[in-house]
Amino acid sequence: VLDYDELERLVTPGTRAVVVTHASNVTGNAVDIARVAAMAHAAGALVIVDASQSAGTAKIDMDAMGLDVVCFTGHKGLMGPQGTGGLAVAEGIDVAPWAMGGTGVHSFDALQPLEWPTRLEAGTLNGHGIAGLSAGLDFIEAQGGVEAIAAYERALAERFLAGVREIPSIALYGAFDQPVRSAIVSLNVGDIDSAEISDALMQGWGIATRPGAHCAPLMHRALGTERQGIVRFSFGYFNTDEEVDTAIDALRDLAC
């Protein structure tokens, strides 16, 4: 869990930007990004939010929260295809192009056009991916929006959490009392390697989980799980109560 007092101590007038993950892809813990933005702006710094885990399952209002830049992926909560994502930039924030050429807008110019978003979109765009991401956004709206999907996924995660908490050898990782968090439950079964548990779940019950380090070695160092890793259960809109109960029963069998 983020220590806001410690963060406030670290953010000084010399800080240029505070880069923060909205929700952890390891534990599901969420950060109060509006509070972080206020700290950053008080010191004259920008706030840049990684919303890869939260976009599509948590309401993000850049203006109301005071966010300068939000980065997101399309293949998680936004239900788009892999290889899609976006960068939302508040008005007045300048971002320099990282690649040049091939926009088809001012083809005889050596530099990128100044207008948005073309200045950051060199080369051929992923048209199929953009169409898929757009379809994902339409689907979310058709289901009642982000809040409706988040409530459903959170209910599944809470159902699962209540069941696995009764298994003595299960170790849980995360602050599950947070009012807003990602629908993730991460755990270990005794001292069994996380990859072994994940493989057993797939082979025995057809349950797909994510073991290992989750591309977050520093988080695992903080949790003390560098050797064992963690088994992550991520609950989505297409999961059911019956599938949750099957996962609980499977862990109960593996923990025996």
Name these PLM-found stretches.
Residues 1-256:
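Pyridoxal 5′-phosphate
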